Amino acid sequence: MSWNLFKGGPKKQIVPKTVERDFEREYGKLQQLEDQIKKLQKDMKKSIEADLAMSKSAVRISSDLLGNPLCEPDVDFLQMVTALDTAMKRMDAFNQEKVNQIQKTVMDPLKRYSSVFPSLNMAVKRREQALQDYKRLQTKVEKYEEKDKTGAMIAKLHQAREELRPVRDDFEAKNHQLLDEMPKFYNSRTDFFKPSFQSLIRAQVVYYTEMSRVFGDLAQQVDEVQLSDAEREQENEARLAELRSLSIVADD
């Protein structure tokens, strides 16, 4: 939005430059805040969707393994995959609880806070329209003041001043209200969002505490023999070599 005086405007300074600078500064801070809130909403939504996709995918993988012929001949392997499936379902359940908590305590407040900005922007537009009306009528008054003071011109000047008065009062009321309330709204952001992000942190702490238990339980149920990465790779290569020795997979 442009705050420059329109061409052919009144000679009289309608709004002091210091007041206009204060207005631009306060409104600029709120515009920046609105952009930041929108970005935060977008990023939080992506994070929630990614969290849910991750846990749902993990459950699908463990369920697929349970129904895979790989598990049929080996009881120990089947027990391990069953334990994995149980762990993934527990993880998904806790993840859903975390997401529900974040939705209620973070996303919903963000949405409610964002809903205020359209009304704020509309109030600024009404203030700008009132300012333009004020300038237009002030220019009209000044034009008549410069004319010869004939009876007809004095009557026109009087009428123009009468038209100007309520328009000026309307602008000054709108301007004063915005200058008073915009800083209050901006300064309220910390008190409004602090509880939400405290809840976000608590939800994350609870979730990862539960995940520590879930995977701790899983670790106790799997094979206690731990192989290093090098040993595991060596074992896999040996098994793969055995498979390649079979005639059905031999190169022609």
UniProtKB/Swiss-Prot annotation:
Species of provenance: Xenopus laevis
Lineage: Eukaryota, Metazoa, Chordata, Craniata, Vertebrata
Gene: bin3
Subcellular location: Cytoplasm, Cytoskeleton
Superkingdom of the source species: Eukaryota
Main location: cytoplasm
Protein name: Bridging integrator 3 homolog
SMART domains per UniProt: BAR
CC per GO annotation: actin cytoskeleton; cytoplasm
Stored PANTHER family: BRIDGING INTEGRATOR 3
PROSITE patterns recorded: BAR
